[in-house]
């Protein structure tokens, strides 16, 4: 914490050691936080997290791994937290409850940021039943080995009584975003433990959406959807329709990352429904990289021309090598069209653009238009390469393009209005 402002970065192992030292010196512990009724949050807020899924997802405002403790006639633990924090998680949980009083554990998802403390807690209570999907058994045993745990496989519509007139109802959420994913609905208190769905990588000490910075909350929610869930939008639409068809009441939606939706919880469901419909706003995103600034000049001229022809259209311009790739992809998600540029290098395009286009392809955007541009000195293949990759990524690529020999001049710039007119049709 002391060295972060000076620019030092730590490995995960170093962060764990540092935090354990902090606990010894200062006696800190993460107390439970009340959610509703007999439900508490017992997770971990990670203010220092900088990336997720390796370095594939940038974390700008911290994150959390949310686990929940239900204490009705039966005591239930909903999910655990990430592996590096597993010992602290279990020790802190012991301060809140006798672990032997836990009647069963619900594993909504087998990924290690949710199941990473299972091995440690099961060492303490090895016979405790674990409720999860059949695919979750495979993913959990695949990661941690076959340990003879007492798995109880559930599917959509299955339920378990937890006393006081309440029960947990399970809903499979296959490919949102793993094959093993599910959500758990608690009757009586009307809480949906949605796991990764409806989450954000966002640290909120106060837990709830109505206590969070609304601008950051909305920014992180759409970033999460755009960069993680977009490929699964068709499945998401079907799953939302299925859940709505259950005619359930939602007082709280409690995801496994970020803020808990307490105030108007259906707002995030409505946003997901809109985002799943091949979402786009009146926006165009220009993404490029450059060698000697010629491609930059074209990018800026295209932005100016879009504004001239369509003043209400939002235009975003990013140098891919300098901008955060997840932020750029969020803007692509919001856009009706994109324009991608690269100079020619080694008969192809810059590696920064090539890698970004591969990520673009993975997200499976639909119903978006695209155009290409770039400078060259000799053979000039970059535009054709860009067009082919954009088509492969599912974009409707227009024929108009800008290929500039050496540095762009007025003759090149004179082609831009035609490109923009075609792009905005």
Model-predicted segments: where are they?
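Structural motif
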Residues: 74-76, 104, 190-193, 252, ...
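Active-site neighborhood of phospho(di)ester-bond hydrolases with catalytic His/Asp-centered motifs
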Residues: 78-80, 102-110, 131-133, 192-195, ...
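Short, Lys/Arg-enriched N-terminal segments with co-localized hydrophobic residues
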Residues: 9, 13-30
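FMN-binding flavodoxin-like domain, especially the glycine-rich phosphate-binding loop
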Residues: 204-207, 214-253, 257-260, 301-316, ...
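Metallo-beta-lactamase
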Residues: 33-37, 132-181, 235-239
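Active-site metal-binding motif and surrounding structural segment of the metallo-beta-lactamase
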Residues: 84-130
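Short acidic active-site motifs
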Residues: 117, 323-328
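Conserved beta-strand hairpin/beta-sheet module of binuclear metal-dependent hydrolase folds
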Residues: 32-95, 183-186, 190-194, 284, ...
């Amino acid at each position: 914490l002391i060295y972060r402002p000076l620019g030092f970065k730590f490995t995960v192992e170093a962060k764990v050691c540092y935090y354990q030292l902090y606990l010894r010196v200062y006696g800190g512990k993460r107390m439970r936080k009340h959610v509703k009724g007999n439900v508490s949050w017992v997770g971990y807020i990670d203010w220092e997290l900088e990336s997720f899924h390796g370095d594939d997802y940038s974390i700008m405002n911290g994150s959390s791994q949310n686990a929940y403790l239900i204490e009705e006639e039966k005591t239930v633990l909903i999910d655990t937290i990430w592996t590096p924090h597993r010992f602290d998680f279990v020790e802190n949980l012991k301060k809140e409850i006798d672990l032997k009083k836990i009647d069963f554990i619900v594993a909504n998802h087998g990924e290690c940021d949710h199941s990473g403390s299972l091995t440690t807690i099961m060492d303490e209570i090895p016979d405790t039943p674990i409720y999860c999907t059949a695919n979750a058994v495979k993913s959990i045993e695949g990661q941690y080995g076959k340990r003879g745990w007492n798995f109880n496989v559930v599917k959509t519509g299955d339920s378990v009584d937890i006393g006081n007139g309440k029960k947990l109802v399970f809903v499979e959420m296959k490919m949102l975003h793993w094959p093993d994913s599910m959500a758990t609905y608690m009757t009586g208190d009307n809480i949906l433990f949605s796991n990764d769905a409806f989450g954000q990588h966002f640290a909120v000490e106060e837990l709830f959406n109505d206590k969070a910075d609304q601008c950051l909350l909305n920014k992180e929610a759409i970033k999460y959807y755009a960069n993680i869930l977009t490929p699964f939008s068709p499945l998401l639409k079907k799953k939302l329709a299925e859940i709505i068809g259950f005619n359930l009441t939602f007082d709280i939606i409690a995801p496994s990352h970020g803020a808990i939706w307490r105030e108007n919880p259906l707002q995030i469901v409505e946003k997901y429904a809109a985002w799943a419909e091949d979402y786009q706003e009146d926006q165009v995103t220009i993404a490029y990289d450059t060698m000697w600034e010629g491609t930059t000049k074209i990018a800026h001229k295209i932005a100016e021309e879009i504004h001239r022809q369509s003043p209400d259209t939002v235009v975003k311009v990013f140098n891919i090598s300098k901008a955060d790739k997840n932020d750029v992809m969020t803007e692509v998600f919001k856009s009706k069209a994109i324009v991608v540029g690269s100079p020619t290098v080694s008969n192809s395009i810059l590696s920064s653009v090539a890698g970004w286009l591969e990520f673009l392809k993975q997200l499976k955007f639909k119903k978006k238009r695209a155009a290409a541009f770039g400078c060259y000195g000799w053979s000039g293949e970059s535009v054709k390469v860009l067009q082919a990759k954009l088509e492969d990524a599912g974009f409707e690529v227009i024929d108009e393009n800008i290929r500039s020999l050496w540095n762009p001049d007025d003759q090149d710039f004179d082609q831009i209005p035609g490109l923009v007119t075609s792009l905005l049709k």
